[in-house]
């Protein structure tokens, strides 16, 4: 497959690029600063541009099969970039979009005190990501949203748990970026995650290559 990656110079985005290439995919990375992506591979194409610019996103999506976004940022970067994806993807003939989000956005999964504290401390980020996800859910795109717990730089291959309905998040939940990256690449190529959200964290119940049919709606 030909995959487009947004956020490829970030900690998780770099791992998405590496794992996608290792799996035999062709990758196009749309980045603001190409010099920050030092990885070299004949199947990696780097394009300079803003993820918030629909024209740049459309250009990157030319001939692509799917898009994976691991974007972070402040202000309205996430919602603006998501709207750019919603606008550009149909014009480019691409419908498959996988977006990495934060467990902090799933506020109803926290206890009331944690919900209040994180809501105050991370209000801007939660508002931005929530707005972007709303635009994605209301679109006709074939989207998947992956909610990941706190990220670590540990090695891949650790256990991963999919939170089922009714399970609560804890601020102590952690997962390796490499395992999140593996999930994102799997999801981009799996019809089982179509128009679904997935909540993942590290744990002892399943292995890192846990089957995608365990996802929740």
Give residue ranges: language-model regions.
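N-terminal Rossmann-fold cofactor-binding loop
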Residues: 30-35, 50-51
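N-terminal Rossmann NAD(P)H-binding glycine-rich loop of SDR-like oxidoreductase domains
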Residues: 3-23
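NAD(P)-cofactor binding segment of oxidoreductase domains
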Residues: 69-99, 124-131
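Non-catalytic, hydrophobic alpha-helical segments
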Residues: 12, 67, 132, 146, ...
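Conserved Rossmann-fold cofactor-binding substructure of NAD(P)-dependent oxidoreductases
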Residues: 42-64
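Conserved beta-strand positions in the Rossmann-like core of class I SAM-dependent methyltransferases
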Residues: 4, 28, 144
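Conserved beta-loop-beta element that borders a ligand/cofactor-binding pocket
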Residues: 134-154
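Mid/C-terminal beta-alpha module of Rossmann-like enzyme folds, strongest
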Residues: 2, 6-9, 171-217
């Amino acid at each position: 497959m030909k995959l487009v990656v947004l956020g490829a110079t970030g900690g998780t985005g770099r791992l998405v690029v590496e794992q996608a290439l290792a799996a035999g995919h062709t990758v196009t990375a749309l980045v603001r600063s190409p010099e920050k992506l030092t990885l070299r591979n004949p199947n990696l194409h780097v394009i300079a541009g803003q993820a918030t610019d629909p024209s740049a996103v459309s250009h990157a999506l030319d001939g692509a099969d799917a898009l994976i976004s691991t974007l972070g940022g402040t202000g309205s970067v996430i919602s603006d970039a998501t709207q750019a994806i919603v606008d550009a993807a149909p014009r480019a003939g691409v419908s498959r979009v996988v977006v990495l989000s934060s467990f902090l956005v799933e506020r109803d999964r926290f206890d009331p005190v944690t919900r209040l504290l994180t809501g105050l401390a991370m209000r801007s980020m939660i508002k931005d990501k929530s707005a972007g996800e709303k635009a994605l859910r209301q679109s006709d795109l074939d989207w998947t949203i992956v909610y990941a717990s706190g990220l670590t730089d540990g090695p891949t291959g650790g256990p991963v748990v999919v939170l089922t309905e009714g399970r609560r998040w804890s601020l102590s939940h952690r997962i390796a970026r490499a395992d999140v990256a593996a999930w994102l690449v799997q999801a981009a190529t799996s019809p089982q995650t179509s128009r679904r959200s997935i909540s993942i964290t590290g744990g002892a119940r399943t292995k890192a290559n846990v089957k995608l049919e365990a996802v929740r709606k």
